[in-house]
């Protein structure tokens, strides 16, 4: 451990203010603190509150973690007061203003880092915070990028950036094409790779992210080498070996309270949820959660609900706590849906204790938006996936889960949900399509049995990776040794 030989290392962590980014960064903070690293997490007051309980327990247990709050620049950026997290925005169409607001934190954060003691040895910053590039350079502190994505997606994005001219020759957004120089033959449409072809202000922001990636000292990835060995190997070549795969970071949550409150306090009583699951047969329940920023239109959500009903299988459906989904809740109540499914359907409005649910023996499938955290948590729990990607890296994650890992079934979504244009897209999978996909995942066919066996094996590999001597545990050691070596010439 680093602290056994010299004053402990001090890492400053900058999570991006979206649940899918903050949750693994807080896990990383605890993993590093467990190895003797002093940790400072920099975030805004509203976001600090979401992790208050989890971090308080960590600090009380003796982990050297400090939480420093900086004011979110609402007024200066033209953002509404109180919207300090991506999941609080009234519309995802306003997300660019939110992303760009963080550049206004550069001056106060640089001042903070100049004054903080002990002097930081390393910055770990989310890829969506390119303003930290300049701070790290000005202060001479090595900066490591945290990518909340898998190496499959990172390699794919890197290759397609290099083949930009090839992409421009493809006229249709619906035409499938193979990724060149990829370990496996995988095909996408242009609309499924939204971070590659952008224009205007979004391009400027993404160019800043790319520059930050290219100039960083290295990259931390929430994956494990045994899950995607060819993609970890090839992405390491791209980054000259400075890649540390340290996942699944969610497995640092060993206490029931930490699992239940990971990311936010759950909006359902933990005991009530477990009691409901205990009443169901092993492997019979489908868990349905489309992430913290699900942007499906009402028409599609209705079809999803009706398909779940017609599947005749028990399910837990997590419904996003956005104000816009009040219409969905009205439909659930007024159409008689809630009454019809009350014996075998559990509805959770808001935040769910996802880790507790996925690890329960009654859960036999996970209908997911394919955010990387959820994809990895499902696999880590040994639960087969029903994939419903929405945007961003999620189509890449679907390809990895279904085509490469053989750990899931596609719902049949072909088109990305463009932020601010969701209503134009409408219904992509009708209730019959939902019912059919659920049956394929949860049924007793030979393919379904083989899939369950395969994902269980992957889950076992995930747990071994984070144990002492495992690949991810060792990679944390290698990371700390690397940063310590950088400090030696300064002695």
UniProtKB/Swiss-Prot annotation:
GO terms, biological process: response to toxic substance; response to UV-B
Enzyme Commission numbers on file: 2.4.1.-
Disulfide cysteine pairs (residue numbers): none
GO-annotated molecular function: cis-zeatin O-beta-D-glucosyltransferase activity; trans-zeatin O-beta-D-glucosyltransferase activity; UDP-glucosyltransferase activity
InterPro entries: UDP_glucos_trans, UDP_glycos_trans_CS
Record bears the keyword Transferase: yes
Keywords for this protein: Detoxification, Glycosyltransferase, Transferase
Superkingdom of the source species: Eukaryota
Binding positions (UDP-alpha-D-glucose): 292, 352-354, 369-377, 391-394
CDD domains, per the entry: GT1_Gtf-like
PROSITE patterns attached to this UniProt entry: UDPGT (PS00375)
SUPFAM superfamilies per the UniProt record, alphabetical: UDP-Glycosyltransferase/glycogen phosphorylase (SSF53756)
Stimuli inducing this protein: Not induced by cytokinin treatment.
Record family assignment: Belongs to the UDP-glycosyltransferase family.
PANTHER family: GLYCOSYLTRANSFERASE, UDP-GLYCOSYLTRANSFERASE 73C1
Function: Involved in the O-glucosylation of trans-zeatin and dihydrozeatin. Also active in vitro on cis-zeatin, dihydrozeatin-9-N-Glc, and olomoucine. Can detoxify the explosive 2,4,6-trinitrotoluene in plant by forming O- or C-glucose conjugates.
Protein name, entry field: UDP-glycosyltransferase 73C1
Organism: Arabidopsis thaliana
Name of the gene encoding the protein in the UniProt record: UGT73C1
């Amino acid at each position: 451990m680093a602290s056994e030989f010299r004053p402990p290392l001090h890492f400053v962590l900058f999570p991006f203010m979206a649940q899918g980014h903050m949750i693994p960064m807080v896990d990383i903070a605890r993993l590093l603190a467990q190895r003797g690293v002093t940790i400072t997490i920099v975030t805004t007051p509203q976001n600090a509150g979401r992790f208050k309980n989890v971090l308080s327990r960590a600090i009380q247990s003796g982990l050297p973690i400090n939480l420093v709050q900086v004011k979110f620049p609402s007024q200066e950026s033209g953002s509404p007061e109180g919207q300090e997290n991506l999941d609080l925005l009234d519309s995802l169409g306003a997300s660019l203003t939110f992303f760009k607001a963080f550049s206004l934190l550069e001056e106060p954060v640089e001042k903070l880092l100049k004054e903080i003691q002990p002097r930081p040895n390393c910055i770990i910053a989310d890829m969506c915070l390119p303003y930290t590039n300049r701070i790290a350079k000005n202060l001479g502190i090595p900066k490591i990028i945290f990518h909340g994505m898998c190496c499959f997606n990172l390699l794919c994005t890197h290759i397609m950036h290099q083949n930009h001219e090839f992409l421009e020759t493809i006229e249709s957004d619906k035409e499938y094409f193979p990724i060149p120089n990829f370990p496996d033959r995988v095909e996408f449409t242009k609309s499924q790779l939204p971070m590659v072809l952008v224009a205007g202000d979004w391009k400027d922001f993404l160019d800043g992210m790319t520059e930050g990636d290219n100039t960083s000292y290295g990259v931390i990835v929430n994956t494990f080498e045994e899950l995607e060995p060819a993609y970890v190997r090839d992405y390491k070549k791209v980054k000259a070996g400075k890649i540390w795969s340290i996942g699944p970071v969610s497995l640092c949550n060993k206490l029931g309270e930490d699992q239940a409150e990971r990311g936010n306090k759950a909006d359902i009583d933990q005991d009530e949820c477990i009691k409901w699951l205990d009443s169901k047969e092993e492997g019979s329940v489908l868990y349905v959660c489309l992430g913290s920023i699900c942007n499906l239109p009402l028409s599609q959500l209705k079809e999803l609900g009706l398909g779940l009903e017609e599947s005749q299988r028990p399910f837990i459906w997590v419904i996003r706590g956005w104000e816009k989904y009040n219409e969905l809740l009205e439909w659930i109540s007024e159409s008689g849906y809630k009454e019809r499914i009350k014996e075998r359907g559990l509805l959770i409005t808001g935040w769910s204790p996802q880790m507790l649910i996925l690890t329960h023996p009654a859960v036999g499938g996970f209908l997911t938006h394919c955010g990387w955290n959820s994809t990895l948590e499902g696999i880590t729990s040994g639960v087969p996936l029903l994939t419903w990607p929405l945007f961003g890296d999620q189509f890449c994650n679907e390809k990895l889960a279904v085509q490469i890992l053989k750990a899931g079934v596609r719902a049949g979504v072909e088109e990305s949900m463009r932020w601010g244009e969701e209503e134009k897209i409408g219904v992509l999978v009708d209730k019959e399509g939902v019912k059919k996909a659920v049956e394929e995942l949860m049924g007793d066919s030979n393919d379904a049995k083989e899939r369950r066996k395969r994902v269980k094996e992957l889950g076992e590999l995930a747990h071994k990776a984070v144990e002492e001597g495992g690949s991810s545990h060792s990679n944390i050691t290698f990371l700390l040794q690397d940063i310590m070596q950088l400090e030696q010439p300064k002695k």
